[in-house]
Swiss-Prot record:
Domains: entry comment: The PPIase activity resides only in the second parvulin domain. The N-terminal region and the C-terminal tail are necessary and sufficient for the chaperone activity of SurA. The PPIase activity is dispensable for SurA to function as a chaperone. The N-terminal region and the C-terminal tail are also required for porin recognition.
Name of the molecule in the record: Chaperone SurA
A Gene Ontology biological process term: protein stabilization
Record-annotated PpiC domain positions: 164-265, 274-373
Principal EC category: isomerase
Compartments in which it is found: Periplasm
PANTHER family per the UniProt record, alphabetical: CHAPERONE SURA
Annotated InterPro entries: OMP_Chaperone_SurA, PPIase_dom_sf, PPIase_PpiC, PPIase_SurA, SurA_N, Trigger_fact/SurA_dom_sf
Gene that this sequence comes from: surA
Tagged with keyword rRNA-binding: no
Signal peptide: 1-13
Protein's job: Chaperone involved in the correct folding and assembly of outer membrane proteins. Recognizes specific patterns of aromatic residues and the orientation of their side chains, which are found more frequently in integral outer membrane proteins. May act in both early periplasmic and late outer membrane-associated steps of protein maturation.
Coiled coil regions, renumbered to chain: none
């Protein structure tokens, strides 16, 4: 997320003194300065990948369309009361810095070096977090996958085949409106075939995606990342497994339009070995009547009492405020570390077996933990069930997200004022 934060944004310093509206989007607008800055970031991204940069006029239309759809989602977030607290934002910024092996101060310095202010970066992260939550509420929470669907998938030839490999894909989507008539569908089909013929003649896939694709990943050259083939709509699910790396599919109609896929890479599966830790803990939470400092002191006192010989389980039953484990003496049983919050996982990883951790803080409160054991288990069966669940959820989510984005775009009032762009008002 947010690779663009490390791109030069010198364009923002060159914004004209008189800004202007390039699109009216329901109750908001997109400004020329926003468009210029985002176009510059995209140009930098493409250049860093070593690709040819499309004409600015082509990029402007693609970027403007993305800004319009982002704006609509942010307006939905505003109407829905979605807010990102400073604490949540700080935590997200910290995670981004950590992923780039930086401290916050190093992260600030890197941003300044690339011409981007820390406040601009925070605003960008906040917007992405709001959009993520809007999509979670409007799309992801509606996705349901039944146990029977998982069983059917695992029993199918397709399921057995696809769970053994992952595919790195890119796509080009020629969209069709939700209520498209036959003429619009035929026009989209012709455009898709034109793109396909250009690709067969050696045109660069990423550049064509940037110039022609209507997918929300167009500006990334259509890169979809790693996917299970079974996530994809038919007929691609079976077709891709038989393809060689570098091959492209012929255009096929999907609910969102006509799509062309390129197979960038493959990787295989094998047995799944999972590390598990047997751990117990005591959780003390701050409250209206107990301050953060008092909570920390209580956790320290409990640590001292356990170190002095008192029984961990009895103290957990008496003091722990984790309803899921307190009655079991704080025992979380054997657990996958990846299921735990990073703060808990990191302390647990550093604590030797049979020893206590010093009191530490997580988003839930203050903890003292004890590692009782470690093991590696063959979780192939469980992993395959989880993979099947993920594949089916992702397949449904991808289809629902594209449908929903197209729906909110079609239903919005949008007036494009960018010179040379197609005029639209709804």
């Amino acid at each position: 997320m947010l690779g663009a934060l490390f791109l030069s944004t010198a364009a923002s310093a060159a914004v004209q003194s008189i800004d202007k509206v390039v699109a009216i989007v329901d109750n908001d607008v997109v400004m020329q300065s926003q468009l210029d800055q985002r176009v510059h970031e995209v140009q930098q991204t493409i250049a860093k990948r070593g690709g040819g940069v499309p004409p600015t006029s082509v990029l402007e239309q693609q970027v403007l369309e993305r800004l319009i759809v982002e704006n609509l989602q942010l307006q939905i977030g505003e109407r829905s009361g979605i807010r990102i607290t400073d604490e949540e934002l700080n935590q997200a910024i910290g995670t981004i810095a950590q992923r780039n092996s930086m401290s916050i101060e190093q992260f600030r310095a890197a941003l300044a070096h690339d011409g981007l202010s820390y406040e601009d970066a925070r605003d960008q992260v906040r917007r992405e977090m709001i959009i993520s939550r809007v999509r979670q509420r409007r799309v992801a929470e509606r996705i349901q996958v039944s146990e029977q669907e998982v069983k059917n998938f695992l029993a199918s030839d397709l399921g057995k085949m696809q769970l053994s490999e992952e595919l790195h894909l890119a796509n080009i989507l020629i969209p069709t409106p939700e209520s498209a008539n036959s003429e619009a569908i035929q026009s989209a089909a012709r455009q898709a075939m034109e793109v396909y013929q250009q690709l067969k003649q050696g045109a660069d896939f990423a550049q064509l995606a940037i110039a022609r694709s209507g997918s929300d990943n167009a500006l990334e050259g259509g890169d979809m990342g790693w996917r299970k083939a079974a996530q994809l709509p038919p007929p691609f699910d079976r077709e891709l497994s038989a393809m060689a790396v570098g091959d492209i599919t012929q255009p096929a109609r999907t609910p969102g339009g006509f799509i062309i896929l390129k197979l960038l890479d493959k990787r295989g599966g094998g047995n799944q070995v999972r590390d598990e830790v047997h751990v117990r803990h005591i959780l003390i939470k701050p409250s209206e009547i107990r301050s953060e400092e008092e909570t920390k002191r209580l956790a320290q006192k409990l640590y001292d009492r356990i170190e002095a010989g008192e029984d961990f389980a009895e103290l957990a039953k008496s003091y722990s405020e984790d309803p899921g484990s307190a009655l079991n003496g704080g025992d979380l049983n054997w657990i996958d570390p990846n299921a735990l919050v990073p703060e808990f996982r990191e302390v647990m990883a550093k604590t030797p077996q049979g020893q206590l951790s010093k009191p530490f803080k997580s988003p839930y409160g203050w903890h003292v933990l004890e590692v009782l054991g470690r093991r590696a288990t063959d979780s192939t069966s469980q992993a395959r069930e989880q993979q099947a669940m993920t594949v089916l959820r992702n397949r449904k989510y991808d289809e629902e997200l594209q449908t929903w984005l197209r729906q909110i775009r079609d239903e919005a009032y949008v007036e494009i004022k960018l010179p040379g762009a197609e005029q639209a008002a709804q």
